[in-house]
Amino acid sequence: MAGTKNKTRAQAKTEKKAAIQAKAGAEREATGVVRPVAKTRAKAKAKTGSKTDAVAEMKAVSKNKVVAETKEGALSEPKTLGKAMGDFTPKAGNESTSSTCKNEAGTDAWFWAGEEATINSWFWNGEEAGNSFSTKNDKPEIGAQVCAEELEPAAGADCKPRSGAEEEEEENVIGNWFWEGDDTSFDPNPKPVSRIVKPQPVYEINEKNRPKDWSEVTIWPNAPAVTPAVLGFRSQAPSEASPPSYIVLASAEENACSLPVATACRPSRNTRSCSQPIPECRFDSDPCIQTIDEIRRQIRIREVNGIKPFACPCKMECYMDSEEFEKLVSLLKSTTDPLIHKIARIAMGVHNVHPFAQEFINEVGVVTLIESLLSFPSPEMRKKTVITLNPPSGDERQRKIELHVKHMCKETMSFPLNSPGQQSGLKILGQLTTDFVHHYIVANYFSELFHLLSSGNCKTRNLVLKLLLNMSENPTAARDMINMKALAALKLIFNQKEAKANLVSGVAIFINIKEHIRKGSIVVVDHLSYNTLMAIFREVKEIIETM
């Protein structure tokens, strides 16, 4: 692009010089036709129009003539100039010079020929037409350049050179105007667009909001006194992980009296030091720091004057009276629950929340709400308190268990035979009879139990046998089982149709009774009863061996 541009510019300058010299000769021979015409047109334009229009007309005429010369010369004589280039040698130099001078008159006549409208339309076709013209007619341009170089000595001998001012004017009109416009349109090295970063505004500390003494500074619970964020010491570091924050709004004197010395002086790992700023509010609200003294004074002003002097940025209002406020302060000193402190801050108007939440707290009553929360702890804590602080005495517990066993025995016997309720009661009684203490209660219902054993189904018999097996381990209860009715009912279960589990339980009952008699735990005084008992044992033994 740059090489083609320089080549075209050099060619235009050469053609311009040839045109100037030819034009000077034509002025001498043709009595100066060009300049009078241009001046006449300029004067006519100056009379009818402004000076600006005259200058533009003169520049347009000069441009049209130069371009017409370039176009006509390149189109009409490509072959002649090509031959002149091919035959141009050091020996034939003089001949070509003479032939060039002979054609000078014809060139002058051709130079001023042409139609102005055609030249104007061709000249303003744009860069595309100029580029295609230069590439297609490369050889004719070279021929025209050689011809112009040979015309220079011939015309220079006969013609007078033009002044420097006129040449500079032509240069400004044609060369500089054309190429400067091209350079301006296409910048090879555009400047990058940079982003302007505006500095962040620096907020100055408002001296009016600074507290006068430490009594106006908020005291946070379980932590040393810190300066609130409204004083200007805002945190620039990322927020650290901290436990749930809550505020006990109190003055320095009240907080020093309410907090023990060990709590105030002991450094905590989770608390912040005095030099560390208060963390930002976690909710979508601006923190509003007010002391209890300020809120108390504002409530008194409102009660006396009937106005609302609250000018805090959160635009929340405190709807409590002085009596309710003092009760709330006393409740806050007795607890450190974060939920209760947050509810208190909402009621005091120092924590910005949804209006519905504040309206709910104000309608219910903040004191009533906090008292109910303090009176009803969590279910786990309440259950633990019942077990640890109010344990029942041994006699009371034993009495309740005896009542429960009697109640279960009555209900079990009252249910229909083989009913689910009866079977559930037998299962519970089997669990209760694992302890010998309650055997004397169940022994009162032996007749009903042996009736169920003889008339119940397989599952009912299984539950009754488990209960009797537990009772047979106790010598006192086993003594009550040694009678003809009970032993006859036990002997009936030993048959081929009985379940194996029931047979095992029946054998275990007889073994327990035999062991009690052998050890002397059970003494049989009546020989008739003893003989009957031994006969039943032999019969049961034979049945078991047969099975």
From Swiss-Prot:
Its main location: cytoplasm. It is found in: Cytoplasm; Nucleus. One of its GO terms (biological process) is learning or memory. Keywords: Cytoplasm, Nucleus. One of its GO terms (cellular component) is nucleus. Highly expressed in brain. Not expressed in lung or liver. Down-regulated in brain from patients suffering from Alzheimer disease. InterPro entries: ARM-like, ARM-rpt_dom, ARM-type_fold, GASP1-3. Residues 1-32, 80-102 are annotated as: Disordered. Survival and differentiation promoting protein that plays a role in the regulation of neurosynaptogenesis. Induces phosphatase PP2A activity which results in APP dephosphorylation and inhibits BACE1-mediated processing of APP. Homodimer. Belongs to the GPRASP family. This is G protein-coupled receptor associated sorting protein 3. It comes from Homo sapiens (Human).
